[in-house]
């Protein structure tokens, strides 16, 4: 991506020369298991599973593309500063009463970073009864490090409680299944150096890494999304296989003694505010940091300045190129500290995403926003008058309908129901009509100051072969590329936090992300509260630099919010926590489709409407969103997690029927847009285990022909264009 002039510019002031030699356990013990439901059912790997082998580390890409030390290659990083530990590790279930098995060879082999329950791990339990909630991982590495440097062992994510021993010494504990954490190895390398290398100024030591992981999944109090241990044997409709253990990359990094640990970025359409934190055991506050904004096309420095470590610097960006779905331009940011002998490369996008009252077209008049005839679960005709709907209903068709009257006081912004069934009695269909009195202004989301309709789909980011972990980088990127293939612009990442490389791909591709906080799905207790708050805060801290993320979703439906009733842990306090943690002041969706959505907090009035969309109106301060709808499913034989067990909100008899129903739903969205509807999230991108309502099958094959895909894309593009203009 970058040319050689930038690579020279990014040369480290201090030469780092990390070398890691890994003593891998026997690879012939590893074998991919069945990628399917209960033992004996389908085997459903994705096309990328065959690329996962033990001969080279899986997912070898640099895990932290937002902060590259001493280089400009966000895929490979600077090879002299880091080394992946992904690959085969020793593995064994843990006895909670026994001491750590220091110095002992473990009996099995596991492929990191795939969750224990995944078929790519090689050790997946074949039944709920065989579920393992405590495990040990063991690996021996020989690290050769440069004198005057420090060595860090990074875990991108491990689910849920992690204990790290090195050469028998406890180095750290961590609770949380979705965030990066690290321990320092410097003392173990230099303090216990086994040998001196041929060149001076370095040390070499062999380290035994022993990692303990405990995951009670849904039996614990911690947020764990939709995972259910019971789903291993008996998958549920919307509960899925757990993902335990080391499920994101593990790696070693060499850094200077005082190093740039993080860079916090807040960019709008004209300025960048940047703050660098220095990890320095002596005097971090006295370190002066230089910031240089670089245009990646011309390699020119377009803005620069200095500030003390920990102090924000505000830089004006001349003639700024803005980030948007249609033009996702990313600036590079070189951050250097001469006193630290350190330099890193970050990146950012210039954009704003706000909620503001904007003028309503045709304000003061009445607008028909919804009129349709539905029979037997299928949308027959949209945009009907009541008389037209009645004409299509007869005793055989058996329609039941509702009408809405347009009588309302001036300025009233709501829908009125004029009751009653039509004359037909068989409840096989519905026909209804809705009118809304349009106010002069209403809340809308604005991207870079302009109105935008967010049309997207729900993404649970589960994989039949990796569960939480995509098998390869190409697989990881595939789902985001599919957003554009189908003409959408948004993803709501549901009940999960993905690896940083996923967000980097969204930044590059221009996909807007609504990011869920992970819930305690249906089983929250008071013990959940501090764990939820900690997870939420760390999620925002570690992901807030990404321009693709435009909104935080604090709660979902009835999953978790009911235990957050008393200050300082009430729902409103959680919304304030999200705002305070996020330096970019993104909108907060209090509760997508749940009871807390009715509280006068947050920025979004968000309903769920299955299967068909229904009217939702903005409030005085919150824009209107249908946070989930659809759930149309064609069940593709040979592509099911458990054959014959698929379910969905609305079954379609063929892919063509599924496509037709969806296209009609986009027309309904266009009808709703004049009343303030500003976002719609369709359920969902892929089938997930028994929930078979994706545009894609669970193995990522498409359900649609190219012509059907083109029709869906055209409908979505029209929805975005027309609704954004309202």
PLM-predicted stretches and their roles:
Residues 3, 24-25, 29-31, 36-42, ...:
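Accessory beta-strand-rich segments of carbohydrate-active enzymes
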Residues 12-25:
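N-terminal signal peptide
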Residues 166, 271-307, 313:
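Beta-strand-rich binding/interaction modules
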Residues 231-243, 257-264, 350-360, 440-447:
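Low-complexity, Pro/Ser/Thr- and charge-rich linker/hinge segments at domain boundaries
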Residues 254-283, 719-725:
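Surface beta-strand/loop "capping" patches
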Residues 336-363, 438-483:
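N-terminal carbohydrate-binding accessory modules
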Residues 359-439:
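Extracellular disulfide-rich cysteine clusters
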Residues 477-482, 490-714:
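Substrate-binding/catalytic cleft of secreted carbohydrate-active enzymes
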